[in-house]
Amino acid sequence: MSAELESIDHELEESIAALRRAGVRITPQRQAIIRYLIASHSHPTADEIYQALSPDFPNISVATIYNNLRVFKSIGIVKELTYGDASSRFDFNTHNHYHVICEKCGKIVDFHYPQLDEVEQLAQHITEFDVTHHRMEIYGICKECKDKEE
């Protein structure tokens, strides 16, 4: 088994354990949605998840996807990313990281810059706020969109 598959399986097991601790029933559909989110690095919308899973789960609906995403978000295993009027996107990676977003196609790419972790501590120290989180986005044009323009 490849290291990536082992990692996906491990993260799936951890997510299922978190759901069980929260008293959430584990269904094949829930497992499939989580597995898709873990394996996908594209920050999919609920519709994209539906399109990917509906061939294997013909009875699944977009409403089912949204309901499960809401449960996952409330437990803390998924983050909802909202950008303007566009559909929400969902990110399995809930650790502090940042996003670069293409202004043309909406593609979102993760990146981590450790020095930015200090921003919360500094903001808390200077303002005396109890800082709970922060969000940073960088916008630009992705390579694929730049190549199309040329």
From Swiss-Prot:
Tell me, in one coarse class, where this protein mainly resides. cytoplasm
A UniProt-annotated Pfam family: FUR
What the entry lists under InterPro entries is as follows: FUR, Fur_C, WH-like_DNA-bd_sf, WH_DNA-bd_sf
Key words, A-Z: Cytoplasm, DNA-binding, Manganese, Metal-binding, Repressor, Transcription, Transcription regulation, Zinc
- Location(s), subcellular: Cytoplasm
Which CDD domains does the protein's record reference? Fur_like
Q: Where does Zn(2+) bind?
A: 102, 105, 142, 145
Q: Report whether Repressor shows up as a keyword of the record.
A: yes
Annotated GO MF terms:
DNA-binding transcription factor activity; transcription cis-regulatory region binding; zinc ion binding
Query: What does the entry list under GO cellular component?
Result: cytoplasm
Where is region (DNA-binding) located? Answer: 1-84
Q: Which SUPFAM superfamilies match?
A: Winged helix' DNA-binding domain
Role according to the record: Manganese-dependent repressor that controls a regulon of oxidative stress resistance and iron-storage proteins. May act as a hydrogen peroxide and organic hydroperoxide sensor.
Q: Name the protein family.
A: Belongs to the Fur family.
Which protein are we looking at? Peroxide-responsive repressor PerR
Originating gene: perR
